[in-house]
Amino acid sequence: TVPTHMEEGEYDAEILPYKYTAHVTVDGRPLNLYAKVKTKFELQTWNATHRIQVGASWTYAKNLGDGQVYDLSRPLNPGSSYTRPRKYSDIPASEQIALFVEDQIGIPIGKHHLEVQAGIGSSMLLNLNSRYALSGKPYFDPRINAQWSFPAIGIGNNDLNINVSGGFGWLTKTPTLAQLYPNKLYMDFVQLNYWNANPDYKRMNLRTYIVDPVNYNLKAARNFKWEVRLGMEFHRNDFSITYFRERMSSGFRSMAN
């Protein structure tokens, strides 16, 4: 038997035949839009050269398809009744705006050279219901990287170049559409199960409850990372060693009730 209803209430289940042929069509019609603007300019302050980038981007993703289309009375997997078909077009679009500014600074210090790259990015999800904790909330991801290059050391006919670098920064990951808009759960409880050798007398009656697992309190996952690196270059051979540490104290996962 399989349920064929889409609403809460009491219904008779469909009695499946011993053999049947199931057909399914997956209708997906994705629409993806992307726009980006970026500008670069340079300026000089004392003996430092600044290469500055400023930009913004906008992304939009929507599926206009019908999703899985099949006869509910002839399912591919009759043992799976917790979900029902859902149109892709019923899922709201994913829309995000992002801004960034970055300054790459080059500073000669005697025969040494210091390169600093500092920037901050900001992103925010759009098209969210006001009940979501993420609605209208921007996240900021600052980051800094620096590299100190020492004077070249002559060894034979080649130079040994040594540099030390390090950096730290934040990275924000927002929930996916599947996490923001999960499928509803259908809880079908058998109220009556009468089995008879005569198919005309067989009957199963169900009481169905629908659970909406949407979590409006979802927040973005934040990841902090820092690293230090020693690099060497000699006669077209590169060697480097890096130590890094990454810490993420938040994230997403599915939990069964």
Outline where the language-model segments fall.
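Polar low-complexity intrinsically disordered regions
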Residues: 1, 37, 44-48, 144-146, ...
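Face-selective signature of the C-terminal outer-membrane beta-barrel domain
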Residues: 1-131
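Structural signature of Gram-negative outer-membrane beta-barrels, strongest in the C-terminal barrel
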Residues: 30-32, 57-59, 90-238, 242-247
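A generic membrane alpha-helix/interface feature
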Residues: 73-77, 185-187, 253
